[in-house]
């Protein structure tokens, strides 16, 4: 064998080993949460027990603050007009972090407002995920910079970071003057416009809130900004003392979760919530692909007498592979007593959970392995019966526009559909 061929063979072997390592790092990690157990007592604390809140705080690192004012901001009609008003009123700081952005009316309106406030000497920071917002043009970002907006991209793909290419920042953050916060599943794209009941208008759940929980949302932004730029944002400009003051009756906090070895805060949150429900458990999620452990927790909840219902997307989904992978598990869940519904009018993109009409979450976190293990995610958790009742009401109203999946009928689907579902489920670790 010639020297050139030997060199080529060595290079080929190195490349194969490198790709194998990347694949291994991508699809494997430590042991996730499989059960929530206790010893010598009655079991995991219900959401109505004060120990539940303390346990959640200890296991996720999220503090649930008293003194917040939280409001749902449903669909584009519910979030954008209020968001534009709050941004235009900013006097000191605006921090925006978005995963998904596309050119259009929404992105243009955001740019116009951010430029105007930056020219008014408000410090404006705009952070986007390099993959999710790849369609924002250089001219768009340069236009922001020229007006004084500080712009950064998070996790741009480099050859030396390729093993982390699947780890995206799926977070949605808007904070105005350290006092008003927004999070949820929305982005900067025109298909979030509207009421969520028409084909081209996505169904979305978001929240607008004031109070100490906003400081946690700001801290999540600061962590991401530091990752991208090396600048850790602190001080009274971003974290004013007045931002920690009580402004309402609601207990709430921001769960910010990121990839790690072993179970993630996202998984611990889900496991505690599924185990803490005693009466009702209403889950709305666009990408619902529960793994073996979470399916067992859902089935155990049914055995405890919990009314477990899942609302997910229909064939109007934007990611068919994930939809098929989720449907692969319908028979098991339906047989165990979990009720499953598919939203009919349009793409459902909401990510919410309500347990016992008391413990709720609204945010960016999907019910799949990508959100649990790969992505940075944010969601507002709320411990409040009034807010929980409003979440229950929205969930039940959404069921009016949904089709319940019945086991007998579902079993009659074609062999072709079953095959696609099985093949899609094989990729669940990456979805």
Model-derived features: where do they sit?
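Charged, low-complexity intrinsically disordered terminal segments
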Residues: 2-431
């Amino acid at each position: 064998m010639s020297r050139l061929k030997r060199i080529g063979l060595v290079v080929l072997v190195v490349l194969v080993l490198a790709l194998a390592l990347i694949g291994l790092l991508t699809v494997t990690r430590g042991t996730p949460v499989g059960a929530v157990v206790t010893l010598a007592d009655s079991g995991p604390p219900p959401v109505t027990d004060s120990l539940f809140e303390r346990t959640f705080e200890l296991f996720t690192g999220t503090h649930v603050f008293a003194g917040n004012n939280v409001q749902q901001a449903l669909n584009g009609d519910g979030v954008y007009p209020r968001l534009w008003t709050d941004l235009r009123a900013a006097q000191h700081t605006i921090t925006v972090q978005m995963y998904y952005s596309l050119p259009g009316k929404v992105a243009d309106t955001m740019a116009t407002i951010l430029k105007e406030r930056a020219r008014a000497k408000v410090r404006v920071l705009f952070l986007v995920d390099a993959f999710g917002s790849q369609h924002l043009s250089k001219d768009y970002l340069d236009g922001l910079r020229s007006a004084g907006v500080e712009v950064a991209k998070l996790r741009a793909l480099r050859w030396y970071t390729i093993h982390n290419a699947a780890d995206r920042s799926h977070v949605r953050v808007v904070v105005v003057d350290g006092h008003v916060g927004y999070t949820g599943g929305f982005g900067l794209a025109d298909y979030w416009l509207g009421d969520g009941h028409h084909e081209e208008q996505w169904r979305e759940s978001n929240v607008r809130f004031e109070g100490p929980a906003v400081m946690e949302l700001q801290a999540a932004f600061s962590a991401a900004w530091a990752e991208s730029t090396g600048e850790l944002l602190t001080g009274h400009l971003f974290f004013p003392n007045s931002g920690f003051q009580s402004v309402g009756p609601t207990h709430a906090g921001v769960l910010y979760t990121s990839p790690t070895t072993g179970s993630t805060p996202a998984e611990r949150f889900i496991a505690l919530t599924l185990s803490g429900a005693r009466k009702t458990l209403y889950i709305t999620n666009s990408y619902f692909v529960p793994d073996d452990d979470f399916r067992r927790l859902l089935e155990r909840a049914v055995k405890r007498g919990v009314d477990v219902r899942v609302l997910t997307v229909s064939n109007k989904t934007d990611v068919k592979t994930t939809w098929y992978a989720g449907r692969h598990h319908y028979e098991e869940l339906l047989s165990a007593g979990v009720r499953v519904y598919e939203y009919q009018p349009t793409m459902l993109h909401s990510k919410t959970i309500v347990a016992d009409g008391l413990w709720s979450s609204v945010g960016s976190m999907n019910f799949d392995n990508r959100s649990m293990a790969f992505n940075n995610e944010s969601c507002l958790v709320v411990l409040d019966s009034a807010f929980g009742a409003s979440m229950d009401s929205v969930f039940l109203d959404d069921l009016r526009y949904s089709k319940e999946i019945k086991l007998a009928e579902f079993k009659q689907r074609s062999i072709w559909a079953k095959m696609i579902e099985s093949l899609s489920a094989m990729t669940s670790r990456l979805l």
